From Swiss-Prot:
<dbReference type="Pfam" id="PF01195">
    <property type="entry name" value="Pept_tRNA_hydro"/>
</dbReference>
<comment type="subunit">
    <text>Monomer.</text>
</comment>
<dbReference type="InterPro" id="IPR036416">
    <property type="entry name" value="Pept_tRNA_hydro_sf"/>
</dbReference>
<keyword id="KW-0378">Hydrolase</keyword>
<feature type="active site" description="Proton acceptor">
    <location>
        <position position="19"/>
    </location>
</feature>
<keyword id="KW-0820">tRNA-binding</keyword>
<dbReference type="GO" id="GO:0005737">
    <property type="term" value="C:cytoplasm"/>
</dbReference>
<feature type="site" description="Discriminates between blocked and unblocked aminoacyl-tRNA">
    <location>
        <position position="9"/>
    </location>
</feature>
<dbReference type="GO" id="GO:0072344">
    <property type="term" value="P:rescue of stalled ribosome"/>
</dbReference>
<feature type="binding site">
    <location>
        <position position="66"/>
    </location>
    <ligand>
        <name>tRNA</name>
    </ligand>
</feature>
<comment type="function">
    <text>Catalyzes the release of premature peptidyl moieties from peptidyl-tRNA molecules trapped in stalled 50S ribosomal subunits, and thus maintains levels of free tRNAs and 50S ribosomes.</text>
</comment>
<comment type="function">
    <text>Hydrolyzes ribosome-free peptidyl-tRNAs (with 1 or more amino acids incorporated), which drop off the ribosome during protein synthesis, or as a result of ribosome stalling.</text>
</comment>
<keyword id="KW-0963">Cytoplasm</keyword>
<feature type="site" description="Stabilizes the basic form of H active site to accept a proton">
    <location>
        <position position="91"/>
    </location>
</feature>
<protein>
    <recommendedName>
        <fullName>Peptidyl-tRNA hydrolase</fullName>
        <ecNumber>3.1.1.29</ecNumber>
    </recommendedName>
</protein>
<dbReference type="InterPro" id="IPR018171">
    <property type="entry name" value="Pept_tRNA_hydro_CS"/>
</dbReference>
<dbReference type="GO" id="GO:0006515">
    <property type="term" value="P:protein quality control for misfolded or incompletely synthesized proteins"/>
</dbReference>
Amino acid sequence: MFLLVGLGNPGKEYEKTRHNIGFEAVDKISYEYNIPIKRERFKGVFGDGRISNEKVILLKPTTYMNLSGESLREIIEYYNIPITNVIVIYDDVDLEVGRLRIRTKGSAGGHNGIKSIIYNLNSEDFIRLRIGVGKPQRDMVSHVLGKFAKEDEKNIEEVLKIIPELAYTIINQGPQEAMNKYNNFRAE
């Protein structure tokens, strides 16, 4: 069983912001594999289904970003999901818009949602799928809570389009194969 988590903030005012790209990515997977995300529990909304022959749970924590780890801890404990089968999708300001980076472990890199997950799981050994949202030209909070510039929207759509295939690759062929295939991806 795999847990795919998209990070974001709840509420209409945060929709389509850079910080909510994880929610959008999980919505894309939900649509592509017909896994509705409608059940409310574990401090989030989730749904379960299959990608290929693997059972998967899709989760969008409804805590704010800096408390995301609480939601993950609850669902992981309930379903007894191995931490190495957890895939967290989130925004990364250190990657340019349209870039992807997959890692199997590591530090939080300054991301408060990832800090919360590492703290609550007491582990860094989960898979991270980072989506580039670009460096801020002004302060960080305004940047991540802001919407994408018109010229960036095409690149973001291109990235979101390949997310379901990327998730399939991680689940069926492993994270190393996904890294080989997608870590050099650049939306043009």
